[in-house]
Amino acid sequence: MKKVRCSAVIIITLVMMLLLSSCSSWTFIRYIYEYHREYYEAEDFLPSGFASYESVKYDHDKKILLFFFTDTMTVKVKYDDFYIAKKNEVEQTYKFLTEPVESDMLEGHYLIPVTEFEYKGFHMRVADGGDYPHKFGIVGYNDDTKEIVYLWFYDTDFDYIASPEQDKEQAMIEFVENNFDGL
């Protein structure tokens, strides 16, 4: 009887180890795939180089809840005397939204409630060409500290930023506060 019980424990342990190792391999492969997909989607928005910068801060935050995830990237660049030239270059490189984006599905709800807003001393502008509100970028300037910040947001399950009863600018500020810890 003891041999049977011991054999059963060994078999169950081996099966569990096999299952756990196969899950971890799948998770690792999926992680690599997800990383490359997210990187290349954000690559079109995020800057590829920084000329004459004083410092660069990069923050990549991924929040996972069961099958849903939110992926955000923050690049904050501090410039010296080159700031004005870099700001003008960014203004010419990016196209920005000129009007809020309202939801076609949910009446009165805004995917992008405002195209420009102030946040922590930065004048923020929403970049044009995103898949609102699932995937888009924001660029911000702070003339006092000579900093430019690039925010990238990706969440396939996100529905809207502002409901009809919310203040539109405050909703956008709360969106940035809740999703971009690195700012």
Model-predicted regions and their roles:
Residues 4-5, 43-47, 125-128:
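Intrinsically disordered, low-complexity segments enriched in polar/charged residues with Gly/Pro
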Residues 1-37:
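Gram-positive cell-envelope targeting signals
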Residues 18, 27, 31-32, 86, ...:
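Alpha-helical protein-protein interaction elements
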Residues 89-183:
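Extracytoplasmic electrostatic interaction patches
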Residues 1, 16-17, 73, 105, ...:
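Detector for methionine-enriched segments
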Residues 15, 67-69, 116, 131:
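A generic structural signal for short, solvent-exposed coil/turn residues
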Residues 2, 59-61, 122-124:
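Short secondary-structure boundary micro-motifs
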